[in-house]
């Protein structure tokens, strides 16, 4: 059995060797998708287009080598002003035409895509005297008006903004109390200061503080409330503040002083 099998293999080898040699590339491989490296598909066939067209992917025309767009009709001519020795602008009739260099890919047919400068309404000039038709008197008047405007603007700025930003002068409330400070303070004390609510138009000065003087009606209402309760609640305090035109702090201090006075009176009675 083993001999017969060997003979069969030998016959197959001899038949394969006797056949004519074939080219590997010409063989139609059934598993071409599994072995793409044998005969790779060109990358050009996979692209949507054989070459990159910038006009297809860009909305606007591409810039040329010199950095300008390839349409000369969108550039208009302008005049360059000249300066005299004293710095004034003189009228000039020389018109300098600036046109960008055309790129290799630009053509005359592209000019229809853009309107010509003659069809467009020019913007009004913001300065007088730049065009070629301006006279020297107009230029001088414009220069004088500009200089006058700058001087007025600088003066207005100094008068309005600079006094508030002058930090070199010290603030009056930061200065030490010297002789000048004492005189200024004495002069301010002599002024008639408005009295607060419920002061009965009287202010009694004790050292550097002012003591509140209650009116008869305010003292009567506070005394009645104290005999009702020696400790006032916050709700009642707000009600008395509205009724007597006093602050809650003034009412609180009055009750504290009234309780202290009541304790002293009780101690005197015990003694």
Swiss-Prot record:
Residues 189-202 have a biased composition (Polar residues). InterPro entries: Caudal_homeobox (IPR047152), HD (IPR001356), Homeobox_CS (IPR017970), Homeodomain-like_sf (IPR009057). GO terms for molecular function: DNA binding; DNA-binding transcription factor activity, RNA polymerase II-specific. Pfam families: Homeodomain. Keywords: Activator, Centromere, Chromosome, Developmental protein, DNA-binding, Homeobox, Kinetochore, Nucleus, Transcription, Transcription regulation. Residues 1-25, 100-135, 178-202 are annotated as: Disordered. Residues 100-117, 125-135 have a biased composition (Low complexity). It is found in: Nucleus; Chromosome, Centromere, Kinetochore; Chromosome. GO terms for cellular component: kinetochore; nucleus. Belongs to the Caudal homeobox family. Transcriptional activator. Interacts with promoter regions for tbx-8.9, tbx-9, elt-1, hnd-1, scrt-1, and vab-7 genes. Binds the sequence ATTTATGAC. Binds to the enhancer region of the hlh-1 gene promoter during embryonic body wall muscle development. Activates the gene for mab-5 in embryo development. Necessary for vab-7 expression in C blastomeres in the posterior of embryos. Required for posterior V6 neuroectoblast cell fate specification during postembryonic neurogenesis (patterning) which generates the characteristic ray lineage during male tail development. PANTHER family: HOMEOBOX PROTEIN CDX, HOMEOTIC PROTEIN CAUDAL. Interacts with tir-1 and let-756. This is Homeobox protein pal-1. It comes from Caenorhabditis briggsae. The gene is pal-1.
